Every structure is written in C-alpha cells, then in structure tokens.
C-alpha cells in the first residue's frame, strides 16, 4: 500500500488541497492579507471545515497587535490544557513568550468552590492580577471569555473561539462588541484545537518574516 509517510509532505499536500478547493468553490473569495490567509487555512486544515472562510471575525488591527505582543515576551493564558498543548511552545519561547493554564491550579480549584463559579472564571481572576503583557486564548469556556470582559482590563489580544451550545455564541458576540483586540468565531463552532491553530499560524508567520 502506497501512501505519504513524511509529516511535512502530508501537511504540504493538505494545504495544496485546501487552496485548490477554495479556488474552485469560492473563486471570488479575497483574503485580507497573507497572515489572514494563513490563519484561515490553518484552521481549515485543523477542522476540515470550510465554514471558517466566513465565520472567523477579526477586529481592526488585531493581527498586527497580537503579533507585536508575541514578539514582546508576552504570556499566553489558555482556558484548557488542550489549547496549551496545541500551541507551539518551542517557537513561542524563541520570541521570549510562554503559555500558562491555571485550570487545575489549587488556587483556582479552591476559589471556584468557595465562590460557586467555574474554574475557568477563577483562572481568569488570577491571570488578570499577574504582571506583564497578556494574551488570552480561549477555545472551550464561554465563562472564561465573559469573565475577562467583566474585568474590563487592557490586554494585548484575545482569541475567543469557545465551542458549544450554552453561552458560546453569546460570549463571542459580546467579544466582537467589546473594546478588546480580538479574533472571534461567530456562531457555535470553535474549539481548543482552533484556538491553538490560530496562535500557531501567527507564530509561523512571524518566524517566516525574520
């Protein structure tokens, strides 16, 4: 049985197929920039879902702001260990950044129990109090996104793509109406894998620009 075995070749072939399908099915579709294209295609690569051509929303200048923050040794806070695991931390470290996820932190577990809130909310409460430049990447917990907006703090960027049926669509809609520099998934779709793919696309773009 013959099949492609090299990881790089598999990925390259996948992106070739994605590009071909977009050209055939959406010949008039226009990407806003090479980075916008890279993000959309990487999310499609992750999900095999071409709806992402239409449901990924970007606030004005968010890509420039987010990439600039990544280059300034920012800390990325994720709502799940899955999102944290999916981000290319080796490449992130080359830009001086790091990832943190407090969902299982004893402080978070204790605060969530005492206050009767989700651990995702308690994790945000701790994260916003820490020093340094912050980026928030949420792919699973609408309550984390709602909580961040309740704090009304200044952050360098937010990836808000929680998936689900309870609060997911509403939290992302609220994000698009906030003052925060953000990338949001419109509707119910999303996920930790999507959140990580968006960050990785920016990191790979920055690596290529060096």
Model-derived regions, located:
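Electropositive, gly/pro-rich neighborhoods at or near active sites that engage anionic ligands
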Residues: 1-75
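Generic secondary-structure signature for well-ordered alpha-helical cores
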Residues: 19-28, 45-52, 71-75, 92, ...
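Conserved mixed alpha/beta catalytic, RNA-binding, or beta-rich assembly cores of soluble enzyme
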Residues: 80-150, 156, 161-164, 172
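Glycine- and other small-residue-rich loops at beta-strand/loop junctions that grip anionic moieties
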Residues: 7, 55, 137-138, 161-164, ...
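Generic structural signal for well-ordered, non-membrane alpha-helical segments
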Residues: 7-15, 32-36, 59, 63, ...
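Conserved, well-structured core segments that form the ligand-binding/active-site neighborhood
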Residues: 1-14, 154-157, 176, 199-210
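Predominant activation on well-ordered alpha-helical scaffold segments within soluble catalytic domains
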Residues: 15-19, 41-44, 64-67, 84, ...
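C-terminal functional extensions of proteins
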Residues: 166-210
């Amino acid at each position: 049985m013959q099949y492609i075995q090299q990881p790089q070749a598999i990925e390259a072939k996948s992106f070739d197929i994605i590009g071909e399908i977009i050209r055939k099915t959406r010949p008039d579709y226009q990407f806003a920039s090479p980075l916008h294209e890279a993000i959309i295609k990487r999310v499609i690569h992750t999900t095999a879902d071409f709806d992402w051509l239409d449901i990924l929303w970007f606030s004005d200048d968010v890509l420039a702001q987010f990439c600039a923050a990544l280059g300034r040794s920012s800390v990325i806070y994720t709502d799940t260990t899955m999102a944290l695991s999916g981000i290319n931390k080796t490449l992130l470290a080359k830009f001086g950044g790091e990832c943190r996820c407090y969902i299982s932190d004893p402080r978070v577990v204790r605060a969530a129990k005492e206050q009767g809130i989700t651990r995702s909310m308690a994790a945000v409460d701790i994260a916003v109090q820490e020093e340094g430049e912050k980026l928030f990447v949420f792919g699973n917990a609408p309550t984390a996104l709602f909580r961040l907006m309740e704090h009304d703090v200044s952050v360098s960027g937010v990836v808000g793509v929680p998936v689900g049926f309870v609060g997911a669509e509403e939290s992302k809609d609220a994000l698009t109406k906030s003052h925060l520099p953000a990338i949001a998934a419109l509707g119910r779709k999303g996920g930790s894998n999507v959140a990580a793919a968006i960050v990785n696309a920016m990191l790979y773009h920055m690596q290529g620009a060096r």
